[in-house]
């Protein structure tokens, strides 16, 4: 990455605290940001990209309503409903309600939207929000540990018309690297009735595991055929078998990059779910973090250094918190052009501060 690139890192004490209340990822945000802080990645230093830590704003009701239904928002933003089971809105089982949910939703959505705003206002070339990346939330329903559709909101924000003497509509590519299919994002932008040969402002590409009985069940998670009535060339999936490794990603990556070059996005959103990494409790893939060809670090570095446009890195899945912390700290180090030995660092902190 060129040294002149600017990196915006979106976080606050309140955001990390509330994100650490997630039933599926308790204390994860605090552990992630403790490690990044301990590595000194927030500190300015010669020879690295400029990084600015930015306190996120809370998303307004209007922000959230660009995608979510009024019924869902009225319920989930009411503090009296925190911790209450409600199957109508998916608040049960793997998306159980919790105390603090009514604050979590606007804080996480606001953080991701703040990241988008730094990119749109040319304040940054790369924006990072590890508490974002919630790709299973539907318009009126929580699902799969996700309660707010910040990924969808980010796409809608970035694709807005850019005013000026020659107004233009930015092109936004969403690349999902989570173990699980980006069902809610893909379904939100899936347009099978698109006229043949027409273009789109958005392109969704999800690389994931898909098999019978594996969450989420979606007809869009498999390979599609152009003869399929539901085919949309701008909503793509690459399903991988159990055991996918660096070699697997290395083989498919030229396809991913060909898609990116052809689409030529102004903005690329990368959902960096860490549950596809070896060591995650799902134990489905055998993907590594390091810099070798096909590894997660290698893929992200390729995006940051050779893909067109600006980039937004979001979090996502990952249920071994130290594993996730190492992954996202390492990806942060790539964004700011710092070489760091994560394998030598212990993970003992459970709190952090910005100094």
Where are these regions (language model features)?
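Generic alpha-helical secondary structure signal
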Residues: 27-30, 62, 70-71, 99, ...
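Charged, often glycine-rich, active-site loop that binds/positions anionic groups
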Residues: 56-84
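A general "terminal functional-core" signal
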Residues: 2-5, 9-10, 16, 75-355
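N-terminal low-complexity, Ser/Thr- and acidic-residue-enriched intrinsically disordered segments
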Residues: 1-66
């Amino acid at each position: 990455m060129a040294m002149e690139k600017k990196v915006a890192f979106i976080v606050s004490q309140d955001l990390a605290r509330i994100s650490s209340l997630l039933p599926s990822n308790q204390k994860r945000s605090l552990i992630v940001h403790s490690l990044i802080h301990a590595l000194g990645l927030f500190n300015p230093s010669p020879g690295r990209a400029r990084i600015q830590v930015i306190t996120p704003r809370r998303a307004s009701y209007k922000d959230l309503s660009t995608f979510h239904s009024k019924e869902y928002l009225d319920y989930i933003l009411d503090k009296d409903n925190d911790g209450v089971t409600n199957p109508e809105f998916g608040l049960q089982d793997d998306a159980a309600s919790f105390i603090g949910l009514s604050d979590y939703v606007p804080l996480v959505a606001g953080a991701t939207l703040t990241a988008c705003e730094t990119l749109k206002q040319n304040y940054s070339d790369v924006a990072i929000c590890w508490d974002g990346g919630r790709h299973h939330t539907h318009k009126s329903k929580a699902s799969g540990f996700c309660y707010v559709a910040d990924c969808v909101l980010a796409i809608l924000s970035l694709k807005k018309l850019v005013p000026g003497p020659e107004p233009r509509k930015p092109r936004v590519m969403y690349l999902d690297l989570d173990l699980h299919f980006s069902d809610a994002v893909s379904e939100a932008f899936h347009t099978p009735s698109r006229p043949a040969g027409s273009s789109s402002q958005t392109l969704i590409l999800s690389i994931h595991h898909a098999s019978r009985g594996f969450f989420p069940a979606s007809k869009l998670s498999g390979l599609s055929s152009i003869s399929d009535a539901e085919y949309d060339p701008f909503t793509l999936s690459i399903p991988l078998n159990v055991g996918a490794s660096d070699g697997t990603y290395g083989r498919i990556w030229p396809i991913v990059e060909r898609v990116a070059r052809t689409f030529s996005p102004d903005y690329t959103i990368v959902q960096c779910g860490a549950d596809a990494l070896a060591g995650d409790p799902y134990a489905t893939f055998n993907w590594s973090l390091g810099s070798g060809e096909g590894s997660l670090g290698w893929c992200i570095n390729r995006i940051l250094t050779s893909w067109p446009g600006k980039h937004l890195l979001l979090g996502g899945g990952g249920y071994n918190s130290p594993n996730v912390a190492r992954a996202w700290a390492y990806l942060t180090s790539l964004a700011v052009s710092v070489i760091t030995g994560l394998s030598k660092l212990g993970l003992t902190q459970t709190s952090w501060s910005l100094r």
